[in-house]
Amino acid sequence: MYAVIKTGGKQYKVAAGEKIKVEQIAADVGQEIVIDQVLAVGEGSAIKVGTPLVSGATVTVTVLSHGRHDKVRIFKMRRRKHYQKRQGHRQNFTELQIGAIVG
């Protein structure tokens, strides 16, 4: 069984037992969270697609860890104008373990 969930402004296709990295969620490590923004649920060839959400469908996840992605370097330059600007960014993430999918 799999589901398509929405969290942090992005959509993820998940199945029970998988680990995913999502945008940072304000929760403690080891805490269980119920995600109710389920866009689709499927098993085999049968699929339920929500409009926009599947009513009554939930995905239970456990917070494994919090961390930061690798640094992304931004470099801006204007040719012939002696203008250069360097900037770096590291995005925070939360690693989740997918538990039960109900729907």
Curated annotation (Swiss-Prot):
Keyword Cell membrane: no
Keyword Protease on entry: no
GO cellular component, as recorded: cytoplasm; ribonucleoprotein complex; ribosome
Pfam families: Ribosomal_L21p (PF00829)
Top-level taxon of the source organism: Bacteria
GO BP of this protein: translation
Keywords carried by this UniProt record: Ribonucleoprotein, Ribosomal protein, RNA-binding, rRNA-binding
Single GO MF annotation: structural constituent of ribosome
PROSITE patterns: RIBOSOMAL_L21
Endpoints of the signal sequence: none
Role of this protein: This protein binds to 23S rRNA in the presence of protein L20.
Subunit and partners: Part of the 50S ribosomal subunit. Contacts protein L20.
Family note: Belongs to the bacterial ribosomal protein bL21 family.
Protein name per the record: Large ribosomal subunit protein bL21
